[in-house]
Amino acid sequence: MGLKKPRNMWLMEFFAASYPRIKFVHMLRDGRDMSYSNNAYFLRQYGDRLYPGWRKNARVAQMEIWAIGNRRAASAARDLPGVAYHLLRYEDLCSKPAEAIAALLEFVGAPSGDAEGFAKRVQPSSGIGRWREMEPLPLSELSRAALEQFGYQ
């Protein structure tokens, strides 16, 4: 079974308790790009609970919630018994698709011989690195630490 809703990262404890030996593929994208995305559904739905006052600067709030949620998910997945964890950065999937897919297939226990075929179907978004072209986003210490934790410069 696979669940691909971004909000599921907030429910690691539930999934770990419900599915012993769960395999968690943590797919994430650079939070700075996410901050400039038009997809603010999660922020609109849960922003008041997670980041009160988010309407003052939605882009900063998007980044903070990205940092909080992804750090929490990674920590929970690593600390909960029985959870296998695999980090897959969207940027790596797009820049090195065969390598990223081979590692993913190995993690889930699928034959890795199909990696090249799957890699040919990867279609990178034009929004990768878009944050570099935008007005600089003020980053909190938490956001900087999360970017570093996940290998973003």
Segments and roles (model prediction):
Residues 1-11:
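Glycine-rich phosphate-binding loop used to anchor ATP phosphates in small-molecule kinases
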Residues 4-5, 15-40:
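Conserved phosphate-donor/acceptor-positioning beta-strand/loop module used by diverse small-molecule
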Residues 11, 15, 97-100:
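Residues at alpha-helix caps and immediate loop-helix transition turns in enzyme cores, especially N-
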Residues 39-51, 55-62, 67-87, 95-153:
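PAPS-dependent sulfotransferases, especially Golgi type II membrane carbohydrate sulfotransferases
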